[in-house]
Amino acid sequence: FTGILGQVITHEEGHRSVLTELGIGSVSKPFFDKNLVAKVTGVTDETLINLRNTDFPNFIRLHTAGLESDYAYLKKEDHLFNFNEEDYGTIYADYFARKLGSQFYYLTLLFKTKVDIKEQDDKELDRDIVGHDIYGMIRHLHRPEMEFYRYTNYNQLTYEEQKYAKKIGYLSLFNFLNPNIWRGKKVQLSENTLATPSISFSLAPFGYFIEENMSLLINNK
């Protein structure tokens, strides 16, 4: 349950938390609607435009926070695995489902994915705050002063923006190098020391980052 439906809840709460921190009210709807998307609603265009014009980093984070939330949750589960605080039999199903769910979002960037949702089909307060998280982030990073709209499709990106999207999609494949996905064994460095190396990729308000980690388990601690 937590791996499939739970990720939708925590992902959308990641988006909403940015608004909550800024004192902006919103409504999380973490259940799939008629367009098969979960969303955060209850925010006017005027509020979002003002956020873009006065607090651009947080406006971009509004797009990335869902995937950042997925990343933070999975990093915590990596910690539990790496330091033997949980075994694969307990939370692996949750971990694997969440990993694939977030990775699927990144892999949509490798194809000409169309978000067939028109803003005018919903009332303003019923619209998702950002639409496609990554397309919206990319468009606003490259063209922060262009006409405001929420739902960004692949064909609305410039050639350079499309290249940037594909770059993110390819770089996200680093996430498959995490040995916990494959239930890999730790590396024996000495009689009392085990290591778990990993590489992770995620979005951030400035674009993206790649993180290298080495977890050391010494005397089983």
Ranges and model annotations:
Residues 1-221:
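Hydrophobic alpha-helical membrane segments
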